[in-house]
Amino acid sequence: QKLCTAPPYGFTIAPLLQARLTRPWYRGRIFSKMGLTAVEIEAGVCRRDLPALGWSLEARVLSPQGVDLCANTSASAETTVLALPCTDLPDGTYELGVTLRDTEGKDLASVTGLKLEKVPPGVDELWFDRENNLYINGTPSFPTGFYSLDWAGRMALASEGGYTLFHTYAGSTPARLDPEVKGSWDWPTWLDAGAAAGMRGFLGFGYRGDGQKDFLARLMRGEAPTEHRQMTDFIRRFRTHPAVAGWYIYDEPALSGRTPDEMAYLYRMADEIDPYHPKLACLVFWTDARFNDTFDVLMPDPYPIRAQGSQPLRSVAEAVRAARRTVRDEKPVWPVLQWYKYEGGRFPNAEELRCMAFLAVAAGAKGLTWYSFYHGYKDNAAGWPDVARIGRELRSVE
């Protein structure tokens, strides 16, 4: 048996210089509530004899407005952090670059195209640090909550259980976003109840359209103007509401045949109107990296307890770790855990619920939700005290 079947040429030589923006980490955005005084760029030089060479590194920020900030340091270690003061940096979009030079000032290598954006102060500002922890207006948070928490009158109950997030599938169709359409969702009442309970919602903004498979293609071609208006008006209407946690880009896009371009279109739609809240997506195939640039939070949904073919509970941890690999640990993973039953199956018991939650945390989840409050509270009300006990216990993760 061969010990190695890989060809001898199957390796990659690292470039001499690599660089990336590490602070701010999330989308390269500076928010006012960060209190950030310096932008940090991590530069790596692929040479072991650096101290003896006397090489230097220069980081620079350039913008069309003529802002020119520069920082220099010696390249004496394989990894170096360069700090550029940013307190007085005007709002706008910038490009960063790093150059490696020898002792005579000759350019040896350079990295350009690192994007930086300083946004105007927002009412609410949510972002992630380098470890993918969520910050809400500067306060760290470990978000936990529910899909399909559809009852405004149950927000306080969920909050008493230690939970901070809520959701409804009413946000999946444009017509239910529009207050002028009969049968639309009562968004003000629902969101106000969430805010009063100290909770925040991740809101869909009509991603399923009119239910036709070609809806997003038509939307992108400008052939669905009514739905486009309903979707964008909804984001504008509630982007400063205190109960907004983020925008829900899509629910299991691969199962609906969605493409990365369609997902990216939805991301831009939300982000151009509201850069202050993250964008989330649930992926049933959480090892599919095609969608990596179309969300800020990856939500895998491993449901191990089934009528047939149940999986070990450790599959939850395996899913979280696999999702982290998919995004290269560059984005947070908030798994969707099981609080419902498959047809012919059963609900998870108290031990299984707690095990799933803390397996996810131990595997590196930076938040989690349950699917779903509607199914669980309606059909498994006896399990609510256990779910609430777990929710209060999870608050210790913060």
Where do the PLM segments sit?
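Solvent-exposed serine/threonine-rich low-complexity stretches and specific carbohydrate-binding patches
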Residues: 65-80
